[in-house]
């Protein structure tokens, strides 16, 4: 089924690659392990969904509107390690060089952008696949939206959400 909208949670990919893969550096001593992992996962997804539109979405640096509403939002989360932070711009550059749209909106989390794009596309009848490791995204699943977990190559539709969480997506 071509012309699906494939929404990639780049921020989820970034942290997954950083924590799952060994630390790698290039000849200049720059960290590259997360970059290698993220780009590898995206390349596989593009190959698996050839003919579909792939869009990669990342969190922007800095606070979001949620911090304005609730100042303690993610206050206990440790800061991003420098070894990971320095890989973000090269990852973004590589994704753009691959010809893929990259969305990163100041003040808005990637999850919110993915949710908005998903609802808009599905509302128009377009099939949407969200590639993420974030379980919160299960609330977006409906007749037009499925999740894919690239770690184990499984997809989750409405029935899969009910099986995994015991409730339908709209109750998550």
Regions found by a protein language model. Name each.
Residues 2, 24-25, 75-172:
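Extended two-metal-dependent nuclease catalytic cores across DNA- and RNA-processing enzymes
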Residues 1-101, 152:
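Domain-level signal for Mg2+-assisted phosphodiester chemistry and nucleotide/NA-binding surfaces
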């Amino acid at each position: 089924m071509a012309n699906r909208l494939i929404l990639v949670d780049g921020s989820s990919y970034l942290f997954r690659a950083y924590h799952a893969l060994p630390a790698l550096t290039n000849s200049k001593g720059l960290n590259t392990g997360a970059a290698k992992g993220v780009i590898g996962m995206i390349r596989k997804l593009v190959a698996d969904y050839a003919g579909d539109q792939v869009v990669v979405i990342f969190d922007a640096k800095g606070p979001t509107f949620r911090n304005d509403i609730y100042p303690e939002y993610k206050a206990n989360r440790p800061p991003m390690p420098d070894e990971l932070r320095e890989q973000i711009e090269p990852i973004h550059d590589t994704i753009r060089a691959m010809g893929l749209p990259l969305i990163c909106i100041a003040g808005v989390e990637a999850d919110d952008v993915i949710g908005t794009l998903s609802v808009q596309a599905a509302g128009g009848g377009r099939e949407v696949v969200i590639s993420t490791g974030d379980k919160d995204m299960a609330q977006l699943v409906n007749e037009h939206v499925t999740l894919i977990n690239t770690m184990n190559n499984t997809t989750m539709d409405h029935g899969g959400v009910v099986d995994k969480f015991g409730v339908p997506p709209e109750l998550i």
